[in-house]
Amino acid sequence: MPPRRSHKKSRNGCDQCKERRVKCDEKHPICSNCTSRELTCTYLKIPIVSAPGRTAHAVTDRSPDPPHQGQSQLKNQNKQPMSSVVSAEPSFVLRDLELMHKFSTDTFRCLCGDQSDMDDWQVLIPQQASKHTFLLHGILALASLHIAATATETTHVLSYLDTALQYYNMSFVPFRQALGALTPVNCDAVFAQSAIITVIGIALPRLNAQHRGECFSMIENMVSVFELLQGSTKVSRISRPWLKASMFSKYDFWMIETGDLDSEELVAIEKLSRLTTCIDDAEHGSANREAIDLLRSCFAKFARSSHPVAILAWLVYTKKEFIDGLRMRQPVPLLILMHWGVLLNELGSHFWWAMGCGRDLVTELLAEIKSEDPVWEQALEWPRKMIGV
């Protein structure tokens, strides 16, 4: 009988694997077993470990302490028994606690249209995140992005941007899996995550490029956001009966009441519509006209509710053929996107994540669309005026 293969035993597995009595790979912040099962992964029951020659490891992403402070702490630690100082690193590390606190006390507001939304995003959505890993990662990514957007020291900005990118990327696979398996149990979490990735998708690449001195195109970024949200129409279509009885019933774009467009908005949309009609595009014409009709609804609904859903829903419901036209830089889809950029610019005066995005988008599109045709020039006048260039 061959000898048994030796293996290193460990008592440092996560709480969930211990309860299930399965081998834990001890990955941080979330082990592979909990990732695949979409469980909240915790290491709260790890025993205190005494190890000769090891020093205490405080898990924190804050700036290092001043030399004299760190030396003082080290002296105090050396006076204590090693077993009282050294402990295994927790899965839910201090930065994660900081980010969850940031979201539940501040960041949640950037997803609210009015006071009636507050309790949903501050309390109920974090509760949902405890059951769905993709939503937990989305919340942590958005909170980290919020800190990066308001930080002043470059090292802090880049550190929190890295954390935001990490959690943003980690949320994709389980989110896509949930999109493909919608149920009344997970539809709230999927809907919430759709809103979160829209906000992050608009703001994160732009902020990251600015602080790293990289080239960036707001047009390309918006195409990426469109593609990112292509599966989200399924959320609205399939889960609408479930959402009617949930916290998200009031966020249904089609149920938002419409207001009256002002005279300039009416004229601008009519010019856009006439221009699109004059250009015979058999492949994309129908998608372009639908995008304009939807845009008109967005203007009307935002005039009544001022809720971000009234604007962001346009990214979800536009057709694939319209997005293809944007990707190929066709003038008409670009012009339609420019008019939506005016609405995005309006959001920038209310929400930190949209600040400057609409202006950058319209400015870039004005440089992209060049025409000496008077009809085109007239269509460009209103967006140019609205952002002040």
Residue ranges and their predicted role:
Residues 127, 220-389:
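C-terminal effector modules of eukaryotic transcription factors
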Residues 4-11, 115-116, 312-316:
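Short helix-capping and inter-helix turn/linker motifs at the boundaries of alpha-helical repeat units
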Residues 18, 35, 140, 144, ...:
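Residues within alpha-helical segments
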Residues 3, 20-21, 37-39, 46-276, ...:
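Intrinsically disordered, low-complexity acidic/Ser/Thr-rich segments used as protein-protein interaction/activation
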Residues 1-49:
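N-terminal cysteine-rich, zinc-dependent DNA-binding domains of eukaryotic transcription factors
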Residues 28, 188-190, 335:
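Extracellular structured ligand-interaction cores
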